[in-house]
């Protein structure tokens, strides 16, 4: 009888262990399903340290102590109902301690004059819509201010904040698309906008070496950019710029040499694309060979992370590719940083080589009997969902009807990955955007995900998606339970002549007794159409009962380093620039 009792208890414990890892979609419980939403942001917009939600660039839902979200009707994010905001990126532009907004609009106001081989402005298309800067009053209510950004039109599909010159104000890198979609080589120039004392912005491309030309196919051509990123790729304390190219063109890594000009070193470090550059299509595709500059990828997103805890920032890039495009069309890939001794060059490992094959709905090309497939990896990010100090990979796929899903790949001890999406109870097809953060402040990260119906017609949705007709967001709450500890960190800089208020560009190292050093950076966006995670740090600590040291490398002109020792786990702390004491927030 005793043996049976013990056996019964063991079965219960094992069952509990199996059920202890997983996510639950609580969008309805949290009151966010009344709004159609493709684009999503998690960001604290009223200064209470709880993450609020922005849906489709226009609805602001304030977080009530991690329990429910309520619409803020007077946010003014949807300031012109006729203007369709393409992306929103949030950061403290004026250093007043609350988070402001860059609101991007895709303006295609030009036509291509084939006879004279030039672009011509079409005033009939211009409705006066431009990009805007909106300042926050601290409660989540925004007002438009006049800046030089609004004096010109462009077609942004990516934007990221960084303080490239470490003057204490965050600058804005704007990644722009085609002047007119379908005209293959006509692209707007990407722009680095320097923040002028929180009141205006200046286009400084010429001053800092970022100017590109309209002529296509050269090393200095403007390229259609569908995303952007920023990180300190080479550990020199300066934030570098990642420009992500569409149309099978090369990506750019702009090395920050401040006070000297930026230089494009993407080819030297193998960030531009993979090694297959023949440009050939499969024999069953009636299409000629592409030139070398058109034999790379369609890169939408990038996720920087020191995933292997070796002190260097690695990258994961999300790509769109198709069976018909051939082997020279880049696949999504992990770019492993090989460090100082190798010139910080990347080793590229295709996603297909580090995880299990994708499950697809089979489609047959009728004429040739060829199985067609698409990879629509528009959004990528990292999440240590089980707090084991090994960041796990999120891939958000969309836009094609062959089972493009939200997927999580668990990082194993040998730094390989395993698809655990089904094990974690996640079921989400058609990703319109992702943002990752701790919504309920319980010490693990949750996932906010938008819904896209791109190429998913009613017939398809009826057959495979239970006939859903409203693209509402999902809020996947992390309900993984284990004994692993954690630590959350908020940074606050002093502002002008010191570090920007939210520490964008800061590097933080977390030292634990087991000898692990986790390296994290605070980012102001990374990816496609405003993809952005909150400017804060949350790390797992495994079974470590304390943090021996937190080391902050502040993004100021003095390159100051601040050290906090002997930090207790399982709390969120606030660290202010050059102040010895820390404050517990949660």
Regions found by a protein language model. Give the residues of each.
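N-terminal signal peptide c-region/cleavage motif recognized by signal peptidases
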Residues: 15-17
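Beta-propeller blade repeat segments, especially FG-GAP/WD-type strand-to-loop junctions
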Residues: 20-26, 59-73, 110-145, 183-204, ...
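Repeat-based blade/solenoid architectures
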Residues: 29-41, 77-89, 148-160, 208-228, ...
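Gly/Ser/Thr/Pro-enriched helix-cap/hinge segments flanking short amphipathic alpha-helices
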Residues: 30-32, 422-429, 433, 441-586
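Calcium-coordinating acidic loop motifs
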Residues: 44-46, 50, 64-65, 91-98, ...
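Hydrophobic beta-strand segments that make up the repeating blades of beta-propeller
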Residues: 50-56, 101-105, 172-176, 241-245, ...
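Short consensus segments that form the blades of beta-propeller domains
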Residues: 78-79, 115-126, 180-185, 217-219, ...
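Solenoidal tandem-repeat scaffolds enriched in leucines and small polar residues
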Residues: 144-254, 263-282, 291-304, 320
């Amino acid at each position: 009888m005793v043996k049976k009792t013990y056996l019964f208890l063991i079965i219960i414990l094992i069952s509990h262990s199996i059920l202890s890892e997983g996510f639950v979609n609580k969008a309805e419980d949290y009151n966010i399903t009344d709004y159609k939403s493709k684009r999503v942001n998690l960001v604290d917009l009223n200064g209470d340290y709880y993450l609020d939600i922005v849906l489709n660039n226009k609805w602001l839902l304030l977080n009530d102590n991690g329990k429910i979200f309520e619409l803020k009707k007077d946010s003014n994010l949807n300031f012109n109902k006729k203007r369709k905001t393409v992306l929103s990126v949030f950061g403290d532009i004026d250093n007043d301690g609350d988070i402001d907004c860059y609101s991007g609009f895709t303006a295609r106001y030009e036509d291509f004059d084939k006879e004279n081989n030039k672009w011509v402005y079409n005033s009939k298309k211009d409705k006066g819509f431009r990009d805007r800067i909106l300042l926050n009053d601290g409660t989540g209510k925004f007002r438009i201010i006049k800046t030089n950004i609004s004096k010109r039109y462009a077609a942004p599909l990516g934007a990221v904040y960084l303080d490239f010159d470490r003057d204490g104000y965050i600058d804005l890198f704007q990644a722009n698309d085609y002047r007119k979609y379908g005209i293959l080589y006509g692209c707007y120039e990407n722009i680095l906008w320097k923040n002028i004392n929180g009141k205006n912005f200046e286009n400084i491309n010429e001053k800092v070496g970022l100017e590109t030309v309209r002529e296509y196919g050269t090393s200095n051509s403007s390229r259609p950019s569908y995303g952007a990123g920023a990180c300190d790729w080479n550990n020199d304390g300066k934030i570098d710029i990642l420009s992500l190219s569409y149309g099978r063109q090369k990506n750019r890594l702009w090395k920050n040499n401040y006070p000297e000009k930026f230089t494009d070193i993407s080819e030297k470090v193998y960030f531009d694309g993979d090694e297959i550059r023949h440009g050939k299509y499969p024999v069953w595709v009636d299409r000629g060979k592409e030139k070398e500059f058109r034999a790379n990828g369609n890169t939408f997103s990038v996720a920087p992370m020191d995933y292997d805890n070796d002190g260097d920032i690695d990258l994961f890039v999300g790509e769109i590719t198709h069976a018909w495009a051939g082997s020279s069309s880049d696949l999504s890939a992990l770019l492993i940083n090989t460090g100082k001794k190798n010139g910080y060059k990347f080793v590229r490992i295709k996603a297909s080589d580090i995880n299990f094959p994708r499950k697809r709905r089979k489609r047959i090309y009728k004429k040739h009997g060829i199985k067609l497939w698409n990879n629509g990896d528009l959004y990528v990010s990292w999440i240590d969902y089980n707090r084991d100090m090994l960041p796990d990979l999120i891939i958000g796929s969309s836009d094609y009807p062959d089972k493009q899903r939200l997927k999580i790949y668990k990082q194993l001890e040998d730094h390989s990955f395993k698809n655990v999406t089904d094990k974690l109870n996640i079921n989400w097809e058609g990703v319109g955007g992702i943002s990752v953060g701790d919504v309920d402040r319980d010490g693990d990260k949750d996932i906010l995900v938008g819904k896209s119906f791109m190429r998913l017609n009613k017939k398809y949705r009826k057959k495979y998606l239970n006939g859903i007709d409203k693209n509402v967001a999902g809020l996947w709450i992390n309900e993984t339970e284990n004994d692993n500890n954690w630590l959350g960190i908020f940074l606050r800089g002093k502002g002008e002549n010191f570090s920007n208020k939210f520490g964008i560009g800061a590097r933080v190292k977390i030292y634990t007794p087991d000898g692990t050093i986790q390296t994290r950076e605070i980012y102001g966006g990374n990816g496609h159409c405003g993809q952005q995670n909150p400017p804060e740090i949350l790390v797992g600590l495994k079974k470590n009962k304390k943090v021996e040291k937190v080391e902050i490398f502040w993004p100021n002109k003095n390159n100051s380093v601040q050290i906090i020792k002997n930090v207790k786990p399982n709390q969120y702390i606030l660290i202010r620039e050059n102040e010895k004491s820390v404050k517990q927030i949660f």
